[in-house]
Design a protein with these regions (language model features):
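Conserved SGNH/GDSL esterase-like catalytic core that processes O-acyl groups on lipids
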Residues: 2-6, 10-85
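Short catalytic/ligand-binding loop motif for oxyanion handling, primarily in non-cytosolic enzymes
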Residues: 12-13, 73-74, 107-110, 151-152
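A generic structural signal for well-ordered alpha-helical segments
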Residues: 21-24, 91, 135
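Conserved beta-strand segments of alpha/beta enzyme cores
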Residues: 27-29, 97, 139-141
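Short, well-ordered secondary-structure micro-motifs
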Residues: 41, 111-112, 153-155
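Alpha-helical scaffolding segments of alpha/beta enzyme cores, especially the outer helices
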Residues: 79-93, 122, 126-133
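Active-site segments of SGNH/GDSL-like serine hydrolases
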Residues: 92-125, 145-147
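Catalytic His-Asp segment of secreted/periplasmic serine-dependent ester chemistry enzymes
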Residues: 116-192
Length: 192
């Protein structure tokens, strides 16, 4: 099984692709850049976009994981929805299954959340709604990592010191959540 991950530092922090590969026994490849939005993965004029388009055109994948910039589903929802739609088209042309990696609200009471200017519950709700809507409209699998973080936020520290990026436990929770969704689908299709 081959998995491609398109996104940013929420993927490469703590080497989440290696964690996902270990759990799924799949080959996992990432195409990431810190701060990247999904729109950039579609732009052949950027290094990241040219590579993403090449990977989708020239290599065979079973699953392609899409992860938007941390607050992008809220601050640029229209752009996010359009990017998911376009990427899902390219992913399906490849014969792969799109998976949305739904990310989390910034750390409760953390400096990143304070800078963003909304409360934790509101950010969680808006992120959850945006990813759920994108998954429904595009018929994708949804790895709801944001909800997994939300459920554990009172009992576990899942964040790096910046209040945005995951610590190792957070990346592991993300890998487990993504793996669970992919393995369930793969088993149903006889791939796992």
């Amino acid at each position: 099984m081959r998995i491609l991950m398109l996104g940013n530092s929420y993927i490469f922090t703590n080497d989440l692709p290696s964690m996902l590969a270990e759990i799924t026994s799949a080959e996992v490849v990432q195409n990431t850049r810190g701060g990247a939005r999904l729109r950039e993965q579609l732009n052949p004029e950027t290094k990241l976009g040219a590579k993403a388009l090449e990977l989708l055109q020239n290599e065979k994948w079973d699953y392609v994981v899409l992860q938007e910039m941390s607050n992008g589903p809220i601050t640029a929802k229209e752009n996010f929805m359009q990017s998911v739609k376009e990427l899902c088209g390219k992913i399906r042309e490849n014969g792969a299954v799109p998976v949305l990696y739904a990310t989390w609200a910034y750390q409760k009471d953390g400096k990143q959340l304070q800078k963003f200017g909304i409360d934790y519950d509101e950010m969680y709700r808006k992120m959850h709604e945006a990813y759920a809507e994108a998954a429904e409209k595009n018929h994708t699998l949804l790895a709801d990592v944001g909800s997994a973080f939300y459920e554990k936020t009172e009992t576990e520290n899942l964040f790096n010191d910046d209040g945005s990026h995951p610590n190792e436990a957070g990346s592991h929770l993300a890998a487990e959540t993504i793996a669970e969704v992919i393995l369930k689908d793969a088993k149903r299709k006889g791939l796992a």
